[in-house]
Amino acid sequence: MQELNGIKIYDKLPEIVCPEHSCLVVWDVQNGLVNWIFNKDQFLNNLKVFIERIRGKMPIVYTLITPPSRNLTSAWHLFAQMRRFKVDDVNKLPSFMAAGSPEREIPETVKPHRDDLVLEKPSASIFFGTNFEYMMRSRRINTLVFTGIATEMGIESSARDAANRGFYPVVVEDCVSSMDKDAHERSVKTMAKLFIVEKAASLLENIDKK
């Protein structure tokens, strides 16, 4: 660790991912996405092991896609959904991640425990429209460890927003995934230049050095 004008700068991985000031984010790991990623079985196994090793050492926050009511959403959101589902009539948009639907559920093998936080959010950033930042500041969290789906969307946008707010963004390379393997790989390569991208085994080894 270095220090400048009273600011503590963590410059080694064990310091950065110290459990005392870190939080694990499990981003949008819901059946409606998990069932379409390119490496479903490997991803779920990697994530299960990682969560099991982390639990009890640092807080864990699960996010859930929570679409706004059709009557309270934006024109852009509706247009984007039309493109996503390839429909030319807004009235033909299917229900997506509706409350109580199987697609909204978190897979059994990685379900949250009682002490984990489940955060409903309306956008592709963990900070937008939520009280997540307030909770992290209150808990004096400096490092956010990102896992989940999709790499090039919510993971990358949340990591960028985290960095812009002064948090250390850490991405667990083998615990993030996407429906688009090429987009996933491009995003990982981009984030490795901007943030901290490490394999789960490396992170666990350094977390355990505390």
Where are these regions (language model features)?
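Glycine-rich, phosphate-binding/catalytic loops in enzymes
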Residues: 41-43, 78-79, 163
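Active-site-adjacent betaalpha module
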Residues: 1-23, 49-57, 81, 87-210
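Von Willebrand factor
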Residues: 53-73
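Active-site loop/turn elements of alpha/beta-hydrolase fold enzymes
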Residues: 29, 65-67, 174
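…and closely analogous acidic/polar surface helices at protein-protein or active-site interfaces
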Residues: 37-53
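Short acidic, Gly/Ser-rich segments with clustered Asp/Glu that frequently serve as metal-coordination loops
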Residues: 30-35
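Aromatic- and acidic-residue-enriched segments that line the glycan-binding/catalytic groove
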Residues: 71-85
